[in-house]
């Protein structure tokens, strides 16, 4: 036989080297949809223990961004890995569909409700718009390879969900947590509505900072409290504020009871003034007022001034000095201007003293008609007029521009105000909600663990939750209130159930269309319908009940995991915790996982103006979804997640390493039929048994990392295995055996069996992350199998077998180290042009006694491990001067070019080549593999 090429077992596979993911992935998605893949997975897990990850609903407005992709991919990895662990893990995606952003978009198209269009028509337009947005986002999420019940998602605007949201509110009411009150809330004058905590963003703003004097109603009596008798000059308390527009609503001056205050006298512009300031702030205040010299007349504790009266600087009444724990000396004067209608601390201390909650400002941010001096002016524009009036009244001590962090509307990006309005609140303390919520936080696992202290602080400090909004597109607060007493109807809970039943059939419009007499009969005249809508955070925050408890696929199991961005501690995690604790006395989740925000390669937020936005659609169209998925998995999500084109290209490089490994495995399984060719692990060649043992240990580590949601550990271990144990060692060594051994012989079938077992395991390891690639591999694996890898469980065929005669794992690790040293010396010889490839080399290993014993244990098979034609082991003491030192003190190496003839078939240089008459160009081993029973390998 002259052409021995046909006697080789050359690798062959349909699995292409290039993934061409951008084009192939959509084809796979089409097949997944056609085959009903998600339902196949559900059917495969009937009766199994449920694992419920509840999807926090993104807002149905605009295209998805990279943050959405991170969130959905992380959820998908968890769902798929839990399914692989045998759980019944349904995934029902959801969308948040009510609220202001949708209203604003619809207003741009059809105008405001009640003007060109009726409120009912407006709601219908909002519903249509939200549905369009859901469809667009759904396609983008599906393109990412996220499996779920995409044809039956939950929408907060589904009639059934709207009805269940009303039912959730009724349970909160039944538990006694709802109350109505006039309280200051975050108010956006552009929205004309209250804002939730989560709808407030803080940005820098320049405000007028002013110091204002409030003259004592009885200066002589006030001076006496400082030990000054018969004082004849006016005495004033001084406040510092950055909101001059709130001064018309001032109703008190707050002091700290234990703080020392000084009475300071000075002369300015020929007038003697006496001011009360916190002792520690006297110097900084007088510097602001350009006072060069002063006299401290006396000192007194804040408690001494409780209920002492001071004249309002421009309105015709006086206000009391009161005591509050919120007063600090961080800035200002140590005396706080107190307007209960315009601040939370002011409101709380005002309640204690029974102060009027004055609110001279309308919904649009304009002073009401009866506001003296400023009627009809917008509050922010009125600031200058307030300052001018104070100056005119000689009450202004200082006025400067002050740059500070100030609350802004998340939607309009404009400054908001605190404004007292009649609203509906969930009380944090009336029935112990705060205390119980804090207990529930302790019972929940927070990942990362700093999430616990973060949400604890928020719950400890948060005010009552204002759940009412003055909007058109939202779930109505379906209450009837007595026109005279403002009390709720005594049968509110049962009435709400009747309303919910109507909403279930007709949607929220049923409430607006409802004639009160239909439910209340003769009582209808005594009651009015509430026209407020619910905060959208109530919509999404109640989905553990309105969706999870209502849908059959969740089996009434309750939620195991919430997973969202770290901004949701004060958003969805908070609202869900409050509602669930109010309804059921417990948290709605067992675990809460948060991921960081995406930033660019320089750590900056994504911004169109900077031009650093990475759109997921662009990535999938260019690189493929699996590259994006690999980046998500490989990034530690506990902090900020850095992404750029360069970083994604690095992910593509890492992907190629995994893909090339998969291709090698598949190509070398060509012709392998597991049913008849599989060699039992205990019967394998030692090296094959070792690599299966390594894969079995790795599988346990990978499963554990998946269970702990440490996906970056999964990718690290996978890359290490592909690059080192497989790529640099095992796969390199077995090429010779795989290609040249007898096709049906034990030596080849042993290593094919190892490759098969590793392939079966690895396709499952990568499936939660590289879903498209895993499917591609799965379709080409030999043997009988189900249609999809996603219905499988972790592979059980990886047996960790160690025979009594086996070489230890440490042995193979040592051999890998020796091989690396040999490779370095061979590479140098190649660079020096002393040899061509490694099979032209004969290597002599000078080793100490211990290493010699290890190296000689596998006899002639050492050359197969080192990929050389010859490998001799001699005592370290015999090392010649030409021998090269290595990083191992126990080893020196000498490489020489072989003088033996090269075997035409295996390319090894062997002395016997040319001595076999029938095959003069072959070595003995190749002849045995062609004509005989095949070579015997014990070790490698």
Swiss-Prot record:
One of its GO terms (cellular component) is cytosol. InterPro entries: aa-tRNA-synth_I_CS, aa-tRNA-synth_Ia, Anticodon_Ile_BEm, Ile-tRNA-ligase, Ile-tRNA-ligase_type1, Ile-tRNA_ligase, M/V/L/I-tRNA-synth_anticd-bd, Rossmann-like_a/b/a_fold. One of its GO terms (molecular function) is zinc ion binding. GO terms for biological process: isoleucyl-tRNA aminoacylation. Its cofactor is Zn(2+). A motif ('KMSKS' region) lies at residues 605-609. Zn(2+) binds at residues 903, 906, 923, 926. L-isoleucyl-5'-AMP binds at residue 564. ATP binds at residue 608. Its EC number is 6.1.1.5. It catalyses: tRNA(Ile) + L-isoleucine + ATP = L-isoleucyl-tRNA(Ile) + AMP + diphosphate. A motif ('HIGH' region) lies at residues 58-68. It is found in: Cytoplasm. Its main location: cytoplasm. The keyword Metal-binding applies. Disulfide bonds: none annotated. Binds 1 zinc ion per subunit. Keywords: Aminoacyl-tRNA synthetase, ATP-binding, Cytoplasm, Ligase, Metal-binding, Nucleotide-binding, Protein biosynthesis, Zinc. IleRS has two distinct active sites: one for aminoacylation and one for editing. The misactivated valine is translocated from the active site to the editing site, which sterically excludes the correctly activated isoleucine. The single editing site contains two valyl binding pockets, one specific for each substrate (Val-AMP or Val-tRNA(Ile)). PANTHER family: ISOLEUCINE--TRNA LIGASE, MITOCHONDRIAL, SOLEUCYL-TRNA SYNTHETASE. HAMAP family: Ile_tRNA_synth_type1. Monomer. Catalyzes the attachment of isoleucine to tRNA(Ile). As IleRS can inadvertently accommodate and process structurally similar amino acids such as valine, to avoid such errors it has two additional distinct tRNA(Ile)-dependent editing activities. One activity is designated as 'pretransfer' editing and involves the hydrolysis of activated Val-AMP. The other activity is designated 'posttransfer' editing and involves deacylation of mischarged Val-tRNA(Ile). Belongs to the class-I aminoacyl-tRNA synthetase family. IleS type 1 subfamily. This is Isoleucine--tRNA ligase.
């Amino acid at each position: 036989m002259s052409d021995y090429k046909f006697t080789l077992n050359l690798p062959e596979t349909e699995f292409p080297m290039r993934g061409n993911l951008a084009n192939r992935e959509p084809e796979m998605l089409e097949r997944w949809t056609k085959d009903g893949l998600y339902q196949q997975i559900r059917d495969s897990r009937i009766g199994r223990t449920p694992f419920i990850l509840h999807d926090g609903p993104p807002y149905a407005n605009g295209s998805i961004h990279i943050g959405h992709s991170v969130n959905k991919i992380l959820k998908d990895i968890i769902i798929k890995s839990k399914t692989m662990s045998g759980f019944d893990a349904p995934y029902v995606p959801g969308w948040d569909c009510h609220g202001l952003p949708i209203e604003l978009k619809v207003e741009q198209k059809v105008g405001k409700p009640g003007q060109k269009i009726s409120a009912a028509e407006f709601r219908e337009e909002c519903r249509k718009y939200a549905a369009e947005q859901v469809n667009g986002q759904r396609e983008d999420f599906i393109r990412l390879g996220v499996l779920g019940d995409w044809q039956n998602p939950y929408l907060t605007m589904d009639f059934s969900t709207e009805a269940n949201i009303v039912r959730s509110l009724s349970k909160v009411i039944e538990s006694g947590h709802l109350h109505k009150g006039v309280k200051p809330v975050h108010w956006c004058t552009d929205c004309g509505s209250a804002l939730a905590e989560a709808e407030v963003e803080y940005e820098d703003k320049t405000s007028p900072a002013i110091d204002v004097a409030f003259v004592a109603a009885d200066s002589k009596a006030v001076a006496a409290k400082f030990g000054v008798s018969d004082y004849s000059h006016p005495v004033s308390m001084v406040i510092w504020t950055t909101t001059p527009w709130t001064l018309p609503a001032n109703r008190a001056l707050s002091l700290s009871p234990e703080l020392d205050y000084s009475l300071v006298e000075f002369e300015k512009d020929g007038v003697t003034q006496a001011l009360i300031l916190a002792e520690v702030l006297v110097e900084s205040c007088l510097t602001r007022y350009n006072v060069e010299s002063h006299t401290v007349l006396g000192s007194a504790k804040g408690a001494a001034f409780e209920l002492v009266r001071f004249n309002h600087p421009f309105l015709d009444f006086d206000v009391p000095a009161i005591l509050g724990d919120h007063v600090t000396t961080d800035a200002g004067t140590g005396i706080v201007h107190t307007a209960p209608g315009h601040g939370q601390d002011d409101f709380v201390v005002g309640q204690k003293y029974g102060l009027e909650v004055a609110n001279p400002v309308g919904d649009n941010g304009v002073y009401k008609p009866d506001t003296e001096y400023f009627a009809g002016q917008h509050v922010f524009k009125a600031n200058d007029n307030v300052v001018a009036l104070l100056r005119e009244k000689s009450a202004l001590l200082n006025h400067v521009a002050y740059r500070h962090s100030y609350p802004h509307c998340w939607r309009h990006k404009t400054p908001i105000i605190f404004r007292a309005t009649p609203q509906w609140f969930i009380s944090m303390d009336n029935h112990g909600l705060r205390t119980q919520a804090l207990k529930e936080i302790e019972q929940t696992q927070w990942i990362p663990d700093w999430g616990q202290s973060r949400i604890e602080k928020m719950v400890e400090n948060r005010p009552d939750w204002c759940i009412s909004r003055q909007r058109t597109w939202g779930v109505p607060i379906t209450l009837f209130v007595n026109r005279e007493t403002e009390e709720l109807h005594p049968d509110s809970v049962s009435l709400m159930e009747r309303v919910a039943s109507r909403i279930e059939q007709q949607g929220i419009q049923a409430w607006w269309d409802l004639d009160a007499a239909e439910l209340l009969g003769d009582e209808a005249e005594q009651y009015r319908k509430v026209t407020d809508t619910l905060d959208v955070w109530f919509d999404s925050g109640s989905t553990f009940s309105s969706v999870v408890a209502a849908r059959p696929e969740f089996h009434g199991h309750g939620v195991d995991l919430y997973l969202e961005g770290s901004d949701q501690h004060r958003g969805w995690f908070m609202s869900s915790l409050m509602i669930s604790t109010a309804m059921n006395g417990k948290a709605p989740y067992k675990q809460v996982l948060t991921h960081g925000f995406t930033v660019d390669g320089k750590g900056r937020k994504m911004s169109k103006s900077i031009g650093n936005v990475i759109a997921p659609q662009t990535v999938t169209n260019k690189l493929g979804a699996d590259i994006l998925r690999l980046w998500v998995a490989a990034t530690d999500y506990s902090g900020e997640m850095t992404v750029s084109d360069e970083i994604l290209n690095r992910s593509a490089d890492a992907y190629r390493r995994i893909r090339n490994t998969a291709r090698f495995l598949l190509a070398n399984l060509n012709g392998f039929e597991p049913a008849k060719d599989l060699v039992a692990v205990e019967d394998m060649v030692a090296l094959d048994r070792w690599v299966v043992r390594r894969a079995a240990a790795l599988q346990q580590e990978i499963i554990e990392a998946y269970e702990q949601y440490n996906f970056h550990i999964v990718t690290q271990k996978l890359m290490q295995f592909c690059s080192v144990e497989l790529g640099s060692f095992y796969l390199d060594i077995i090429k010779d055996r795989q290609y040249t051994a007898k096709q049906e012989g034990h030596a080849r079938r042993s290593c094919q069996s190892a490759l098969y077992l590793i392939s079966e395991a690895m396709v499952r390891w990568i499936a939660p992350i590289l879903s498209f690639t895993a499917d591609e591999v799965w379709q080409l694996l030999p043997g009988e199998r189900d249609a999809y890898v996603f219905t499988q469980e972790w592979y059980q065929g990886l047996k960790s077998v160690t025979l009594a005669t086996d070489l230890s794992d440490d042995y193979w690790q040592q051999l890998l180290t020796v091989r690396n040293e040999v490779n370095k010396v061979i590479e140098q010889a190649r660079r020096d042009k002393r040899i061509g490839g490694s099979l032209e080399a004969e290597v002599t290993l000078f080793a100490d006694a211990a290493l010699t014993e290890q190296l000689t244990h596998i006899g002639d098979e050492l050359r197969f491990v080192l990929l050389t034609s010859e490998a001799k082991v001699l005592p370290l003491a015999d090392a010649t001067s030409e021998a090269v030192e290595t990083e191992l003190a126990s080893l020196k190496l000498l490489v020489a070019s072989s003088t033996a003839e090269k075997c035409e078939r295996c390319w090894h240089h062997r002395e016997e080549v040319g001595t076999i008459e029938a095959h003069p160009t072959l070595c003995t081993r190749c002849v045995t593999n062609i004509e005989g029973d095949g070579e015997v390998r014990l070790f490698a």
